[in-house]
Amino acid sequence: FSAAGLYNVTVSVTDSSGLTSTVGRQVVVYDPSAGFVTGGGWIMSPAGAYKADERLSGRATFGFVSKYLKGANKPTGETEFRFQAGVLNFYSNNYDWLVVGGARAQYKGTGVINGRGSYQFLLTAVDGDLIGKGTADRFRIKIWHRDDSTNADVTDYDNQINSTAAGSDQEGTVIGGGSISVKIR
């Protein structure tokens, strides 16, 4: 791939009997020198986002920074997300990767909810000012854990209700206050 980004790669294999199997994976291509992202503010968390009680909605606050230090191959920073109606307090403890491209930045890592557990998260931030004056900033966070008995990923929180917007500048929820800044180097 010639540019940093998230790419969906699909491989199809057909055996001598004509049976076909297809497997898809997302491939992350990052450039540690591409830039960084920072933001803080709040969103109105939609009903359906908090999987423990999908009826809940209301204000959720966030604060984050993700960047590569010089010579590093993993980003550093902090991420905090609080959804008071669901008594969900998420804090990051490690980052895996960061991709910055255009008005959008996305990064993945691990963290804890209410000081416990082992959760993964994916944060997407869109800087509306880089799209055009008057365009709103957008924020998405998906938090999940691995079910030990089934070895399946289980979503705990995801404010991306409209899955067709994923991967675009319309991904996430318009922020109600605060700002998101994607800095391209």
Segment roles from a protein language model:
Residues 60-121:
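Predominantly extracellular/secreted and cell-surface proteins with exposed
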